[in-house]
Amino acid sequence: MTSLTKVVAAVAGCSAIVNGAVIPAENGLHTTTLQTRDTAKGTGHILSKREPVTIAILTAAGTAAVTAIVNEAVSAAAAFIGDISNFDAGREAFTVQTTETMMANNPDPERFQAAACYNKAFSVADPANIDGQSSVEFRLGILNTDYECMYIAAPNQFFTEGDGGLINLSFTHTDRCTFDQETADLTCV
């Protein structure tokens, strides 16, 4: 049993290291989150009904070209997620997939240093340096929530006014941005 205890401790340690980590990609972009969801509770072999994720763009503001790219990223994320049975897992996949797709299709890499999706209250230092902001409804069966997804141009700061975690927040950004683990805020220079 001692070896099993060591394996469990090692896995838990690795999990703690990953939580709140910056995940580097081969293209030099980083997806940053503040993961707070309890991953120790597994569903085991529970069978459940799988349902398709539906996404609706509620409102959009910004230049037409940039807003179109945000909307395409949102649609691609919904297609990528497909049919799922867990609302929280779907939300986590949605936030990460959307911001990564947005940055992979960045219309102006010199200007836009980050993509964000967040479903809590937020503010920014310079609203003029936000583009493509879209209000998105994420729905699975009777459960739903909404997100704001947008590009962040530098210089700017994105201030979170709620909790983080992949379920609520994802930033994909260049090295010109830094993520504050304590506040879950992003600063781009």
What is the meaning of each model-derived region?
Residues 15, 22, 30, 44-46, ...:
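Compositionally biased, intrinsically disordered low-complexity regions
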Residues 11, 18, 26, 40-42, ...:
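Intrinsically disordered, low-complexity segments enriched in small/polar residues
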Residues 1-54:
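Fungal secretory targeting signals
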Residues 1, 26, 31, 44, ...:
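Generic N-terminal initiation segments characterized by hydrophobic and/or small/turn-forming residues
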Residues 87-189:
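Amphipathic, membrane-inserting segments
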Residues 52-93:
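Membrane-inserting effector segments that mediate pore formation, membrane fusion
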